[in-house]
Design a protein with these regions (language model features):
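Short, solvent-exposed secondary-structure boundary/capping segments
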Residues: 111-123
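Conserved "cap/hinge" positions at secondary-structure junctions
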Residues: 98-99, 144
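Short beta-strand-centered aromatic/proline hotspots
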Residues: 101-111
Length: 149
C-alpha cells in the first residue's frame, strides 16, 4: 500500500500548497446537536477534493489537539452544504457561513463516506448551526489562509 505523504518524511516541505481558489457552497440542512464523546478519527491527510454538486457536513470543536490524525470528541453539528464551486480544502482553511468567520478547518472524518465527508472546524466555543442562526441558503466559503494551523 502506498504511504501517506503527509504522515512521514516523504515530502521535502511541511507546506506543499502555495495558492488555491475558494471552495463555495450553500447551506441545505441546519443541525442542532452536540456530542461529548463522538470519537471522530481525523484522517492524516490535510487536504481533500470537494466536487461540485457534492454534499458535505460542517462540525465544530474546541479541542486544541484537533488536527489531521487526531481523535475529536467534543463537537457541535452545524450544517450540511452543497458545493457550487469545487476545489481543494485544506486543514487551516478559514470557513465562513453567511459572511461570518466560523473557524479554521482542523481536519476530515470519513465515517459516512462515500455519502458525505465530515469537515471538522476548530472554534472557540462549539455551537450548533441552529444556535448560531445559520439559515438555509447561507453561503459557505472555505478560503485559503496564509497562516496555517
Amino acid at each position: 500500500m502506498p504511504k501517506e505523504p503527509y504522515a512521514g518524511d516523504i515530502l521535502d516541505t511541511q507546506q506543499p500548497f502555495t495558492a488555491k481558489s475558494d471552495v463555495v457552497g450553500t447551506v441545505v440542512c441546519i443541525m442542532n446537536a452536540h456530542a461529548e464523546q463522538r470519537g471522530f478519527e481525523l484522517i492524516p491527510s490535510p487536504s481533500r477534493a470537494f466536487a461540485r454538486g457534492s454534499i458535505q457536513e460542517l462540525i465544530v470543536t474546541d479541542e486544541p489537539q484537533a488536527s489531521p490524525g487526531a481523535v475529536v470528541n467534543r463537537v457541535a453539528y452545524v450544517c450540511f452544504f452543497e458545493i457550487e464551486i469545487g476545489g481543494i480544502v485544506l486543514a487551516g482553511d478559514m470557513v465562513e457561513i453567511g459572511g461570518q468567520e466560523l473557524g479554521q478547518v482542523a481536519g476530515f472524518d470519513l465515517t459516512h463516506a462515500p455519502n458525505h465527508m465530515n469537515v471538522i472546524i476548530h472554534v472557540a466555543q462549539p455551537r450548533s448551526g441552529a444556535e448560531m442562526g445559520v439559515a438555509l441558503g447561507d453561503r459557505v466559503t472555505l478560503r485559503y489562509t496564509v497562516e496555517r494551523t
